[in-house]
Amino acid sequence: MRSAQVYRWQIPMDAGVVLRDRRLKTRDGLYVCLREGEREGWGEISPLPGFSQETWEEAQSVLLAWVNNWLAGDCELPQMPSVAFGVSCALAELADTLPQAANYRAAPLCNGDPDDLILKLADMPGEKVAKVKVGLYEAVRDGMVVNLLLEAIPDLHLRLDANRAWTPLKGQQFAKYVNPDYRHRIAFLEEPCKTRDDSRAFARETGIAIAWDESLREPDFAFVAEEGVRAVVIKPTLTGSLEKVREQVQAAHALRLTAVISSSIESSLGLTQLARIAAWLTPDTIPGLDTLDLMQAQQVRRWPGSTLPVVEVDALERLL
């Protein structure tokens, strides 16, 4: 016997969270809970404003239609990426095919004062990996901050993300302020320039490795080994079903590229599932999941070690 519930939720964000020039005041999304007999599976559907093609209202319509079809015996996945991902996670939990083991080691995200990151990294056991958003301020400032961090922590490797913010000139201004002796400790820089060709040229000219992120979701993208390209950053909420995520990871690994499972600012429920997916598909790579502290609460499932208050399922708005 099948049954299902759909919940709508909204989490207040910390002040100062900006996505593509818009301030994100709340994180809005949906949960689906599928039950069959004694088994249960959850999934999160939370399109990311400015990045997802669909809104959460559109996702809600597609999700409710899919749930009704599933209750009637149809299991075909929807095409909308955020819904396909959430539904496939719920189905995987239901079938017990999403392993429980999780990688909760997140590369800490530097959102402001580099001194805060230095203190956080001092306590980090094992491999020291952190992420810094660049492209939000002047490229020269970004270069100086990155250089400071690499100089202060000799065993640090940085992941940088520019979200295609730079012109070729700004990319050169950034690189000018990063000591060439430190550049090999930039694990990769995600999408430095507005076009892939400019990003490739940046990698050639600076010796700083790059990673593809937004490019993975463009229709003309193909997985190929290229000089200067070291990694792909896979955001499942923006990608689609678990199977599509797995296919992308396998395609990257076949080319000896690093595949990084990364957050689209999901709630704690979605983040714990991403930690499980990372342990399953990319066991040797620290995932990019350090986004929970951008929110003011956890929901339904806790992230280990977080002190944020937890909103239980009874407090959510039920749609079905």
UniProtKB/Swiss-Prot annotation:
Mg(2+) binds at residues 161, 190, 213. It is an enzyme of class 4 (lyase). Its cofactor is a divalent metal cation. GO terms for biological process: menaquinone biosynthetic process. Keywords: Lyase, Magnesium, Menaquinone biosynthesis, Metal-binding. Signal peptide: none annotated. InterPro entries: Enolase-like_C_sf, Enolase-like_N, Enolase_C-like, Mandelate_racemase_C, OSB_synthase_MenC1, OSBS_N. Pathway: Quinol/quinone metabolism; 1,4-dihydroxy-2-naphthoate biosynthesis; 1,4-dihydroxy-2-naphthoate from chorismate: step 4/7; Quinol/quinone metabolism; menaquinone biosynthesis. Its EC number is 4.2.1.113. It comes from the Bacteria. The keyword Magnesium applies. Pfam families: MenC_N, MR_MLE_C. It catalyses: (1R,6R)-6-hydroxy-2-succinyl-cyclohexa-2,4-diene-1-carboxylate = 2-succinylbenzoate + H2O. The active site is at residues 133, 235. Transmembrane segments: none annotated. One of its GO terms (molecular function) is O-succinylbenzoate synthase activity. Belongs to the mandelate racemase/muconate lactonizing enzyme family. MenC type 1 subfamily. PANTHER family: O-SUCCINYLBENZOATE SYNTHASE (PTHR48073:SF2), O-SUCCINYLBENZOATE SYNTHASE-RELATED (PTHR48073). Converts 2-succinyl-6-hydroxy-2,4-cyclohexadiene-1-carboxylate (SHCHC) to 2-succinylbenzoate (OSB). NCBIfam families: menC_gam_Gplu (TIGR01927), PRK05105.1 (NF003473). This is o-succinylbenzoate synthase. The gene is menC.
